[in-house]
């Protein structure tokens, strides 16, 4: 028994064709929106590529750009089919193309669903990418005179100011690395020499942070050096007092920014997926109800439309049998080829 068999008269067929035509062009606009979102996300990721460890994070924007382009191309084509389906003289030329087109639509809908899922599941890989990228960026913060790294100081400073964050996980990350270049330390100073010699790796480590970690909303002048030294500042206790530094780490700030953006885009992708599924089902109904018209010369006559010619269970069973028969045929051909090869050698 056919799945979701429905009777169609001329009026219902016309309404179905007109509704599908409108939905197809809505899907084209949705495809443009997907493409635009992919381009925007790619630009946002490229802006901060210096603090990202690899290019894996570009899978989502690339997928959105591809899905948007395909949505525009695939939905412009059935718009013409729906328009011509109302004319009995024009529709027959589209008949051979409809089944292959519906198969392509099914594959496209699977991929667009997968893209939507990835938008929501990308947080884990993005977190790892940002953690490693920010760590490397902070390590090279001091290298303002080394080609290829001289821009990182500006990048990190602008990042911390824009996202109101400090360090990777927090401001204490700056205490664990040398962020002041040796050329600005004054190597002859006894204090500098003692601090470098006291470190196993020979680095100049201080309990200080770059200026970009300072919170301008604080009423107190920024304490960016000797942050943990209470005696160095008047009426100050770093353990009880709210510091005038950003407390949030940049990894958390960037992660929240990108994941909220990708979640919104994921919602949009699923909305487009629902629209595409509706169009595909509608096209299947249109295809079958036009094929089952008893008398093509009488457009007023009733016809039947369905999604699957058999029940879902029977369709899956017959599809599995087809796959198995194709597998057996492939084995027979392989065996025949091997026998022919042996005969040639002998």
UniProtKB/Swiss-Prot annotation:
Keywords in alphabetical order, please: Cell adhesion, Disulfide bond, Glycoprotein, Membrane, Transmembrane, Transmembrane helix
Task: Name the source organism.
Answer: Xenopus laevis
The main location class comes to: membrane
Side Cytoplasmic, residues:
1-24, 81-99, 291-346
Name the Pfam families on file: Tetraspanin
State the membrane topology.
Answer: Multi-pass membrane protein
Q: Which residues are glycosylated?
A: 229
Q: Which InterPro entries match?
A: Peripherin/rom-1 (IPR000830), Peripherin/rom-1_CS (IPR018498), Peripherin_LEL (IPR042026), Tetraspanin/Peripherin (IPR018499), Tetraspanin_EC2_sf (IPR008952)
Q: Which residues lie on this side of the membrane: Lumenal?
A: 44-61, 124-264
> Transmembrane ranges?
25-43, 62-80, 100-123, 265-290
Note the superkingdom of the native organism: Eukaryota
Q: Which family does it belong to?
A: Belongs to the PRPH2/ROM1 family.
Quote a single Gene Ontology cellular component term.
Answer: plasma membrane
Q: Where is the protein found, in the record's own terms?
A: Membrane
Q: What is this protein called?
A: Peripherin-2
GO terms (BP aspect):
cell adhesion; visual perception
Q: What does this protein do?
A: May be involved in the morphogenesis of retina outer segment disks and the development and maintenance of the retina ultrastructure.
Which tissues does it occur in? Answer: Found in both rod and cone photoreceptors. Specifically in the rims and incisures of rod and cone outer segment disks.
Tell me the name of the encoding gene: prph2
The record's note on quaternary structure and interaction partners says: Homodimer; disulfide-linked.
């Amino acid at each position: 028994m056919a799945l979701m068999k429905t009777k169609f008269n001329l009026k219902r067929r016309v309404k179905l064709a007109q509704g599908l035509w409108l939905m197809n062009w809505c899907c084209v606009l949705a495809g443009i929106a997907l493409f635009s979102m992919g381009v925007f996300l790619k630009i946002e990721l490229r802006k901060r590529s210096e603090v990202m460890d690899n290019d894996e994070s570009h899978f989502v924007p690339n997928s959105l750009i591809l899905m948007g382009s395909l949505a525009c191309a695939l939905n412009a084509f059935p718009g013409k089919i729906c328009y011509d389906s109302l004319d009995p003289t024009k529709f027959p030329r589209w008949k051979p193309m409809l089944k292959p087109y519906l198969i392509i639509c099914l594959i496209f809908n699977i991929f667009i669903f997968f893209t939507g899922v990835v938008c929501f599941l990308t947080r884990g890989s993005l977190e790892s990418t940002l953690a490693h990228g920010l760590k490397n960026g902070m390590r090279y913060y001091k290298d303002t005179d080394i080609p290829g790294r001289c821009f990182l100081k500006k990048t990190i400073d602008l990042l911390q100011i824009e996202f109101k964050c400090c360090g990777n996980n927090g401001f204490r990350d700056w205490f664990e690395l040398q962020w002041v270049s040796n050329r600005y330390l004054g190597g002859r100073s006894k204090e500098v020499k003692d601090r470098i010699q006291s470190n196993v790796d020979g680095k100049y480590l201080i309990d200080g942070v770059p200026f970009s970690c300072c919170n301008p909303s604080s009423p107190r002048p920024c304490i960016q050096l000797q942050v943990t030294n209470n005696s160095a500042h008047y009426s100050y206790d770093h353990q009880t007092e709210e510091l005038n530094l950003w407390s949030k780490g940049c990894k958390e700030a960037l992660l929240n920014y990108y994941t909220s953006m990708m979640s919104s885009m994921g919602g949009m992708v699923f909305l487009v997926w629902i629209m595409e599924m509706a169009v595909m089902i509608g096209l299947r109904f249109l295809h079958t109800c036009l094929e089952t018209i008893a008398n093509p010369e009488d457009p007023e006559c009733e016809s039947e439309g369905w999604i699957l010619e058999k029940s879902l269970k029977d369709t899956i069973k017959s599809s599995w049998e087809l796959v198995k028969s194709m597998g057996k045929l492939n084995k027979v051909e392989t065996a025949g080829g091997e026998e022919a090869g042996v005969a040639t050698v002998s």
